[in-house]
């Protein structure tokens, strides 16, 4: 019996496996799983495990390998199945997405007692039966078959036939060989030699190939470009993701386009790179038309990714924008020509400006009063005695008398009288202190100052050009340049 995908899960169904994982792996197991690479794609993953007598002493290593690899596939839509084979094959865990059942299946897998032969084809047969009953192409199917030792007799041939049937059902087959296996046998069972993972270091080295299996098997398409196209335009799409080349080994990759959920067309890719696929796309003829893009392999039997959507939009013609830009440039050129052409074509002749008038010199008033000069009785000058000369007093320094008195000869008995009192010099009153307060500096004051300086510079240059322009009534002539031969 095959269990289907669970649609509703109670909170308890998630709690038990979480506590079980914590108990098995320790407190750091959940944190370590978060730090390691994981796969978020939805898979139907089938583990086909060898439980023959040759692995009896190493079964716990096989169990740990399955347990750790299961933790890396973190999609809530992932479904798992555990199948063991020896002389016969047994389904330990039917295909299910119920996390509670998966936890219970891991416990049952741990309790398996290995014994018997290595009939790997029996395990592949049970996987194919579940794939047929799993619900078509809703999810990709992956088979990971693990065995040790050489396959004897007709077992390799039977296993190859079952693997071909798996691929016809849309599944990918990966093989893990431990110790004394034969590489060529597993390469014929797997999809390609790149999908065979040898573990020659023994069962303890199984955990070392988990990342390699994850990188090969987790094929995801994460991004589509372009997301919108112009109506009626031919284009190609680029789908980027990881592990893209792992599905292109047989050239069966197809790009499927579905227009408006009605018309479907498949195209082979133009090129396949390690992280991208380039596909030709059909033309969209209506505004708002949608195109769903998906990738599949095995001739469309195995879906790689969910559909990504492209939308058609009306695109304006770029010629109109170019014409508008050219018109604006022409208008700007005409305006510049109107402004600068008079400067190039006229020499303005103007009268020189009159010389500036000499500034009027103002006599400085002496705020200090004139000093009193001594008076001299000049009656003794010149006559050398009394008689014939009237008495005359000369005030030195008054109305030119200083120079006149300097020519006189002072008599022997001339009397010089000096006034005792002098007029005091008045002191200037102190200047009053300014009453206005300094303006407060705002946060934008430095910015405003720089902008004002820039604007002043622009206006200064504008005024310089404006002054050079001829005004009404100015006369001149065009400047003509001609080459004069050297004499």
From Swiss-Prot:
Residues involved in a divalent metal cation binding: 52, 54, 118
GO cellular component entries: cell surface; external side of plasma membrane; membrane
GO MF annotation terms: metal ion binding; signaling receptor activity
Ranges annotated as spanning the membrane: 319-339
Family: Belongs to the ATR family.
Job of this protein: Necessary for cellular interactions with laminin and the extracellular matrix.
UniProt-recorded name of the protein: Anthrax toxin receptor 2
Gene: Antxr2
């Amino acid at each position: 019996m095959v269990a289907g995908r669970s649609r509703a899960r109670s909170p308890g169904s998630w709690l038990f496996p979480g506590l079980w994982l914590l108990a098995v792996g320790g407190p750091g197991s959940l944190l370590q799983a978060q730090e390691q690479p994981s796969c978020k794609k939805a898979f139907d993953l089938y583990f086909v495990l060898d439980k023959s007598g040759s692995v009896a002493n190493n079964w716990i290593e096989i169990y740990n390998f399955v347990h750790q690899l299961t933790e890396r596939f973190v999609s809530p839509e992932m479904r798992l199945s555990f199948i063991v084979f020896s002389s016969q094959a047994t389904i330990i865990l039917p295909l299910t997405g119920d996390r509670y059942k998966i936890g219970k299946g891991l416990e049952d897998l741990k309790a398996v007692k290995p014994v018997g032969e290595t009939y790997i084809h029996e395990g592949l047969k049970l996987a194919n039966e579940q794939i047929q009953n799993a619900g078509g192409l809703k999810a990709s199917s992956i088979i990971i078959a693990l065995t040790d030792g050489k396959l004897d007799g007709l077992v390799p041939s039977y296993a190859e036939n079952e693997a071909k049937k798996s691929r016809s059902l849309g599944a990918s087959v990966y093989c893990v060989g431990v110790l004394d296996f034969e590489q060529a046998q597993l390469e014929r069972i797997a999809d390609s030699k790149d999908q065979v993972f040898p573990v020659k270091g023994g069962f303890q080295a199984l955990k070392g190939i988990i990342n390699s299996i994850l990188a090969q098997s987790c094929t995801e398409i994460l991004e589509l470009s372009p997301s919108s196209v112009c109506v009626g335009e031919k284009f190609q799409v680029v789908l980027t993701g990881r592990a893209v080349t792992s599905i292109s080994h047989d050239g069966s990759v197809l790009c499927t386009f579905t227009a408006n959920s009605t018309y479907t067309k498949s195209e082979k890719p133009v090129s396949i790179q390690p992280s991208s696929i380039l596909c030709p796309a059909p033309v969209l003829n209506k505004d708002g038309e949608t195109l769903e893009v998906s990738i599949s392999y095995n001739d469309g039997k195995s879906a790689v990714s969910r559909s990504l959507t492209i939308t058609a939009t009306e695109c304006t013609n770029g010629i109109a924008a170019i014409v508008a830009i050219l018109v604006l440039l022409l208008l700007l050129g005409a305006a510049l020509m109107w402004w600068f052409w008079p400067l190039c074509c006229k020499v303005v002749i103007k009268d020189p400006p009159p010389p500036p008038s000499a500034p009027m010199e103002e006599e400085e008033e002496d705020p200090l009063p004139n000093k009193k000069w001594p008076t001299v009785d000049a009656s003794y000058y010149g006559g050398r005695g009394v008689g014939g000369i009237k008495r005359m007093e000369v005030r030195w320094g008054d109305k030119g008398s200083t120079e006149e008195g300097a020519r006189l000869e002072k008599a022997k008995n001339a009397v010089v009288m000096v006034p005792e009192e002098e007029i005091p010099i008045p002191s200037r009153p102190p200047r009053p202190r300014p009453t206005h307060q300094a303006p407060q500096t705002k946060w934008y004051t430095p910015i405003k100052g720089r902008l004002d300086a820039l604007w002043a510079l622009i206006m200064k240059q504008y005024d310089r050009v404006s002054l050079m322009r001829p005004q009404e009534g100015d006369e001149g002539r065009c400047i003509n340049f001609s080459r004069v031969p050297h004499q």
